Each structure stands twice: as C-alpha cells, then as structure tokens.
Design a protein with these regions (language model features):
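Short, Gly/Ser/Thr-enriched beta-strand-loop segments that form substrate-interacting elements
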Residues: 391-427
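Conserved active-site-proximal loop/helix segments of enzymes involved in bacterial cell-wall
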Residues: 223-253, 289-291, 324-392, 462-490, ...
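Active-site-proximal helix/loop microenvironment
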Residues: 194-203, 286-348, 356
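Extracytoplasmic/periplasmic proteins that interact with beta-lactams or build/remodel peptidoglycan
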Residues: 41-47, 53-170, 354-357, 468-493
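Active-site-adjacent helix/loop patches that line small-molecule binding or acyl-intermediate pockets
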Residues: 168-177, 207, 222-234, 240-295, ...
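Active-site SXXK
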Residues: 156-161, 179, 197-224, 252, ...
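A short, well-structured edge-of-sheet supersecondary motif
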Residues: 161-189
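N-terminal Lys/Arg-rich, disordered targeting/topogenic segments
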Residues: 1-39
Length: 515
C-alpha cells in the first residue's frame, strides 16, 4: 500500500518482501557495517605496496632522466682517492679549508706570533702532514707554512655559511689582480671535496659570451629570437623561430636565457670554437696540481652542443676553475690562484721556491671590460637582483656595483642541485672576487648569490657604509716574505735534504735548491 511497483518488487522475492532486505523494521535500527575478510585485507595491503612501488619507480625514472646525459662521462666516487697524485709538496700546500683544520691553523698562528698579521700558520712534517711543535718548539725537520688566507675573513665566511645552513658547499674569496686567496672555506670537504669537478651550469654562459665577443668583434649585432619559456630547451628550439621575443647578449646573460645561448652555440660558434674557448680559459686543465681537470661530455648531436653552450649539461669544473675566471674578468689575463706566502724550515730560514710566472693573456682588455659591464645586469636587474637588495629594495652594497653570474643545475655524484655564483667588485675596478658553490638537497635556505652578497658586505662595508677602499684591509701587504709560491711551479719536489746554504756559514738565511 502506497509503494506501487516498488512494493510489488519486494513482495515478489520469495514472499519476504521488504523484511528480506531489512527494510521496514524500524527507522532507528543500526545498519550493518561492512567488514573486510582476510583475503580483502591482504588485497588492500598488496595494493598499497604496489602504489608505493609505482611512486618510487616514477621518482627513479625522473632521476635517471635528469642525469641521462651526465652519465656519459663516468666519474669516480667522491670518496675515492684524489686524482693526479703529485709530489709531497702538493699535499704540503693543501690549504686548511675545513673547519677543524682551520681552527688548528688559527691557534698555531697565535702561538707563533700573537702580534703578527691575522694569517693562518701550520707546521708540516716531512710526510706532508700537519704537526704540532713539541714543547712549543719546531722540529728541525718540520716546515712552517704561512698561508695568505686571512684568519678573520675566513672565520666570517664560515659564519656566513653556517647561518645559511650550508651543509655541503665551498666559498672562495680572492684578489683577482694577483690571484691571491684571502679565504678558502669548505663545510664538508670529505663528502663534497673541493678538488673534484662538478656541473658548471650557467657559469659556462660567461665563456660562451666571451667567444661571441671575439667572433663578432663586439655585441652590437648579437641577438636572438625565442618562444615560450627561455629556460626550456629541446631540438626544435635550437633554431630561431620565424617570430617571437627578441633578446640581446646582455639581457640573455642577465636572465640566463638557455634558448638564446644554445642557438648561438649551434649557429654562431660551433663545437671547435667553443672547445677552443674553454681550453684558452684553462677549464680543460687542472687549475692547480691535485685538482681535477675540467671535462667536456661527448657531443654527438646539435642538442648536445646547445646544452654545452648554455650550461645545461656537458661540462664539469672545480671551484678553483671558476675562481681563476675572476682574474680574466678583471683585465683579460689568467692568473693562477695561490695561497702560500712563504715556507720556513725548522731553523727559521725561508725556502726560496720558483718565482711566479707572468699572467697569461686570454682576451683583450676592451672585451674583458665589456663582458664585465654586461655582467653587472645580472645583479642589477637579472637573476641575482634580489640577492643584492635588502628587503626594502635598497642596494646592499650602496653605490658599489657587482659583476656576476648565477648558475644552477641538477646533477649526480653526489646527486643534488648545484648552485653557483661568481662575481667581482667593484665592477669598474675589481679588487675582490667571490665564488660560492653549494650542493642543495630537497631543503635549502639561501641561494649562493645571497651568500656571496653577504661576503661582499663583509669585505666592503662597515658602520660608516660601503666603499671600495675597505677591501685594502684584506688585500694589503702581510709583511716581509719571499716571493709568493705559485702552486704549479712545484712540479718537481724540493726536499730539505736537497737544500744547501747559498754561502756556507754566511748566515744569510736564504736557502736554494741544488741544481
């Protein structure tokens, strides 16, 4: 009654009607809740594991896709022994870049001379290991190494990286005019060694731009047309489209335009010219003994060449390679970095080592000045603009300008996001060069450009403001010393057993090696 066809449907099922299905027995009766059988529970569990496996498989596929081209160049594991084993003097001259060894060298300097300039000092035994003077006195076999690294500046750089929560990273501060290192810091030198080559990322664009300036006799006619996302690259985007957005060389550098630099590498330069430029800049040789040489991956297609010229893949360099770039940006000459002021034997006599070689001309001064001028756009309105401005939008260095370049790329061995910054300041007349490289994981706190900006602040700024002359407190004379040691001059080891006085019994204190 009152149910019509629906009521007849229930009554036609064995005479049980609505009661068969539990209907009509009261509105407040609790409904039965479904329960999984043992088989059902196992099915759900297996399905859950399958979903997790799919997610992990997709992640692994993504990682493999990201590193597919990088896998062409086999790399030794970072925990392996350093390559290019050199003579004992090479290990002797390895600077105290880790925190623990830095603190030891700091204390040794105070023990040696509390009133001396704030540089780092170590005693090295005949095996090339740091040693503590027994009873406060040096052994006759020990050698005292006085580094050019400034103790106060190095401590400040360590603090900047600590505040930035940089777990694996390197920072170098140097005088680009002389190649003299003022600070050399590594937060995790065992797992992320500074002597290994890592993806160069968009820092390569600086060398590509230098090659374009050489080929085109200036940048007036260098421009490109691109479509879509300037950072995305594929085979179709290697050729200029019939219409799209236009960019010149300076803007492409400032915004790190991958499409433009890949087009220029393919259509304007070619592989031989690009390789020759990398070789001329010294990036295919070790920057100093004991460090890896830069390496170019195999170039088989136009896309490989485009990726090399834009920095998306194909080249690995060490932080010291990039540090040497600051000297070329300063006046077009390549000056090898160095960090030893002098070496003294156990009797207090300076060991005279080979004189430094003359700087090598890489590009003329006019083109170097123009390239440096274009790189100012990176910090003024490009990819590093936010790093060099305060939260209120004011320049962090006042009227001082910085010429620089950013770079970031996901790489392997170890896997992570490699983020670079290289810069010189003041851009008009560089006195300081800064290089920062950090390996970022899934969680990171500060960009390398932000860390570099803080380092520049420490160098140039005080309570009275920022000025170029403030750099003199770090780059000034450290006192009487022999001619600075150029690391590459130590191809043949000089042992104390081979040394004789210049004039026997003269007491001159100057030591020379036997021929």
């Amino acid at each position: 009654m009152g149910f019509g066809r629906r009521d007849r449907f229930f009554r036609g099922r064995g005479g049980l009607g609505r009661h068969r299905f539990g209907l009509g027995r009261g509105r407040n009766r609790r409904r039965r809740q479904g329960r999984l059988t043992t088989v059902g529970r196992l099915a759900v569990l297996v399905g859950g594991f399958a979903c997790v496996g799919v997610v992990l498989g997709l992640k692994g596929g993504w990682v493999a896709w990201q590193s597919r081209d990088a896998a062409r160049v086999p790399l030794p594991h970072v925990a392996a022994a350093p390559p290019l084993a050199g003579p004992p003097w090479v290990s002797l001259l390895t600077p105290p870049i880790g925190r623990e060894r830095f603190e030891q060298a700091r204390r040794r300097a105070l023990e040696f001379d509390p009133t001396a300039a704030p540089r780092l000092v170590e005693w090295i035994d005949t095996a090339g290991h740091a040693s503590a003077p027994a009873g406060g006195r040096e052994s006759s076999d020990d050698r005292r190494v006085e580094y050019s690294l400034d103790e106060r500046l190095t401590a400040e750089v360590f603090e900047i990286l600590r505040k930035g929560r940089v777990e694996s990273g390197h920072a170098i501060v140097l005088d680009p005019r002389s190649g003299r290192l003022l600070a050399y810091v590594s937060t995790n030198p065992e797992a992320f060694p500074p002597d290994r080559a890592y993806p160069a990322a968009s820092i390569v664009k600086v060398l590509t731009a230098a090659a374009l300036l050489e080929e085109k006799e200036g940048d007036a006619g260098i421009d490109c047309v691109y479509r879509g996302n300037k950072y995305r690259l594929n085979r179709r985007r290697l050729d200029p489209p019939s219409s799209g957005r236009r960019s010149g060389l300076e803007e492409a550098l400032a915004t790190s335009n991958n499409q433009c630099f890949s087009q220029w590498a393919v259509h304007e330069l070619g592989e031989p010219t690009l390789r020759a430029t990398l070789r001329r800049f010294g990036w295919l040789e070790p920057p100093v003994p004991g460090h890896e040489a830069g390496r170019i991956g195999e170039i088989q297609t136009r896309l490989d060449l485009g990726r090399l010229g834009s920095g998306l893949d194909g080249l690995r360099v060490t932080p010291l390679h990039v540090a040497a770039l600051t000297s070329i940006l300063t006046d077009g000459r390549s000056v090898e970095p160095w960090w030893v002021d002098r070496i003294v034997d156990g009797e207090g006599r300076s060991i005279e080592l080979p004189a430094r070689a003359e700087p090598r001309r890489v590009m003329d001064t006019v083109r170097a000045d123009r390239l440096r001028e274009m790189l100012v756009a990176t910090t003024a309105r490009g990819t590093a603009r936010g790093a060099f401005r305060s939260k209120r939008g004011r320049p962090r260095l006042g009227s001082l300008s910085v010429a620089g370049k950013t770079g970031n790329l996901t790489g392997s061995d170890p896997f992570g996001r490699y983020e670079w910054f290289v810069g010189v300041a003041p851009a008009e007349d560089p006195r300081i060069g800064v290089v920062v490289l950090q390996l970022q994981g899934h969680l990171w706190w500060r960009k390398s450009s932000e860390l570099a900006a803080s380092i520049f602040e420490e160098v140039f700024c005080d309570r009275s403001g920022c000025r170029a002359e403030a750099a003199n407190r770090w780059t000034g004379d450290l006192g009487p010393a022999v001619a600075p040691v150029r690391i590459s001059d130590l191809g043949g080891p000089i042992r104390l057993s081979q040394l004789t006085s210049e004039r026997a019994g003269s007491g001159s204190g100057r030591i020379h090696a036997k021929p």
